[in-house]
Amino acid sequence: GAMLAGLLGLSCAFAAAADQGGITLNFKDADIREVAATIGQITHKNFIIDPRVQGRVTVVSSRPVSSDAVYATFLSVLEVHGLAAAPSGDMIKIVPSLEARQMPGYPYNSSTPGDAVVTEVIQITNVSATQLVPVLRPLMSTEAQLAAYPQSNVLIVSDRASNVTRLMDIIQRIDQSTD
């Protein structure tokens, strides 16, 4: 934990490792502003962050993903935390979304890790990620986000940690080789 905390203290850029096949995300309880800065470097997008934007996020991808998938993942993270990315000229403003007031507050500092909101990028191998969306959606909480990124056949899931763990188990069972 101390090494990770030190790493995050220096720069979140180390938490996103570039690879020939793409980028592997590994943010654990990271400041959302630092995550935004790193996503900006990866995607070459410029963000203006509203002073009200704060909180800690966990984003993990099991395999390297494209920079487009990284941005799609970041948008899901924002949405699940009641935030939105609003393009403004060459910049993208990160602000509280209008829906944020109606959403229940997320426990950023919850003592129960299963209650923390996490985002997972899940590589699907044997079935279409898009086909999994209608199967998984009814199993998710109302605040959760689920998106398929067909170009690299990945699912992006944002929900409470306990639900994401359960969904990953279900996905693993569905995504079996038919051989």
Which residues does each predicted region cover?
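Bacterial N-terminal signal peptides that target proteins for export
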Residues: G1-A5
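Sec-dependent N-terminal signal peptides of Gram-negative outer-membrane/periplasmic proteins
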Residues: L7-D179
